[in-house]
Design a protein with these regions (language model features):
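Membrane-anchoring/interfacial helices and their immediately flanking loops
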Residues: 1, 129-169, 173, 205-236, ...
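Hydrophobic alpha-helical segments characteristic of transmembrane helices
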Residues: 1-10, 85-102, 152-191
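N-terminal transmembrane hairpin
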Residues: 1-81, 88
Length: 251
């Protein structure tokens, strides 16, 4: 992936891409690879092969990091939106007012800019206020938000609010159930994210130990044996380093 495409993809996730910082991090990784490889007595032609592989993988790793951050931010936004609109509707009983209350939650005062969800809610409010619709005006308004943030629980919340808005009736108990369901969903999702991070940490520690074992093995071999200079030794050591990098990347 060339830098322009990488920058474009990162910007789509709502983050600023700095080519200078990205290259600085890549240079630090190269220095780390060279240091480890020299300690393991890997020859330069094999070190260059490792560096080439890392160079190919690096843009995908960067993009994966930003996409994960983007998905986590989207999850935080949609759960905050669900909570706010449910509480507002429970208190005021009107979808339009509940949307207006929810929109204020997503304005970044420090950066003085609107978030993506703030903009989507604004367009939904505008659609309701115009009063022009091909079908159910609330369904069409909520569809604007669901286009980017849609998920089963959000659909359920929106469908219920439309039902109460159009048919009336007592909604406090049902909204409490939806709020509880949202809370449990958040707890399960954050538990999964913590577990994923723990697995990544364990993989990193395991890779570190594997490098330590190889290094100790190299130290224990007398230099006059010349084993580390053998072609098969260089290939195996290089293969182990590459496999560990791939395992970390896929983990």
């Amino acid at each position: 992936m060339n830098p322009k495409n990488l920058k474009k993809e990162v910007n789509r996730c709502g983050y600023n891409f700095s080519l200078k910082k990205t290259l600085q991090y890549l240079l630090m990784i190269f220095l780390g690879i060279i240091l480890f490889s020299v300690l393991l007595k890997v020859k330069w032609q094999y070190i260059l092969a490792i560096i080439a592989m890392v160079t190919v993988l690096y843009p995908s790793v960067i993009l994966m990091i930003f996409r994960n951050m983007y998905e986590e931010k989207k999850f935080e936004d949609v759960t905050a939106y669900m909570e706010q609109i449910l509480y507002s509707f429970k208190r005021r009983g009107k979808i339009l007012i509940a949307l207006e209350d929810a929109r204020t939650l997503f304005f970044d005062e420090e950066k003085e800019k609107q978030g993506d969800l703030h903009e989507a809610i604004g367009r939904a409010i505008e659609h309701i206020q115009t009063g022009v619709a091909k079908g159910n005006i609330y369904q069409e308004a909520f569809a604007i938000i669901e286009e980017e943030y849609g998920c089963k629980r959000l659909y359920k919340v929106h469908d219920y609010l439309i039902q109460v808005e159009t048919s009336g009736g007592e909604c406090n108990e049902a909204i409490d159930i939806l709020l509880t369901d949202r809370k449990l969903w958040m707890e399960r999702t954050y538990a999964l994210l913590r577990e994923k991070k723990n697995i990544k940490t364990k993989i990193t520690i395991g890779i570190g130990f594997s490098f330590l074992i190889i290094y100790l093995a190299v130290l224990m071999i007398p230099a006059d044996f010349g084993i580390t200079d053998l072609f098969i030794s260089q290939i195996v050591t290089t293969g182990v380093i590459m496999c560990n990098i791939l395992i970390w990347f896929l983990g």
